[in-house]
């Protein structure tokens, strides 16, 4: 049971702050993005944004 807890904890930490060649990646979840944009009567989509050495995956409403 303790091993399972440690594995889940590490999975959550790595998922929230992934390091790839010095770039931090943030994760956008499509269902959550669509729900947030529905309030504005728009369609939501996860898109990649690049800023200096960082790459972000963010939600955009169209």
Swiss-Prot record:
This is Potassium channel toxin alpha-KTx Tx773. Disulfide bonds join 28-46, 33-59, 37-61. Keywords: Disulfide bond, Ion channel impairing toxin, Neurotoxin, Potassium channel impairing toxin, Secreted, Signal, Toxin. Residues 1-18 form the signal peptide. One of its GO terms (molecular function) is toxin activity. Belongs to the short scorpion toxin superfamily. Potassium channel inhibitor family. Alpha-KTx 23 subfamily. The record marks 62 as: Aromatic residue of the functional dyad. Has the structural arrangement of an alpha-helix connected to antiparallel beta-sheets by disulfide bonds (CS-alpha/beta). The record marks 45 as: Basic residue of the functional dyad. GO terms for cellular component: extracellular region. Expressed by the venom gland. May block potassium channels. It is found in: Secreted.
């Amino acid at each position: 049971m303790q091993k399972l807890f440690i594995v889940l904890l590490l999975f959550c930490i790595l998922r929230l702050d992934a390091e790839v060649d010095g770039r931090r990646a943030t994760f956008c979840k499509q269902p959550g993005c669509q729900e947030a944009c529905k309030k504005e009567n728009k369609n939501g989509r996860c898109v990649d944004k690049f800023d200096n050495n960082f790459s972000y995956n963010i939600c955009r409403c169209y």
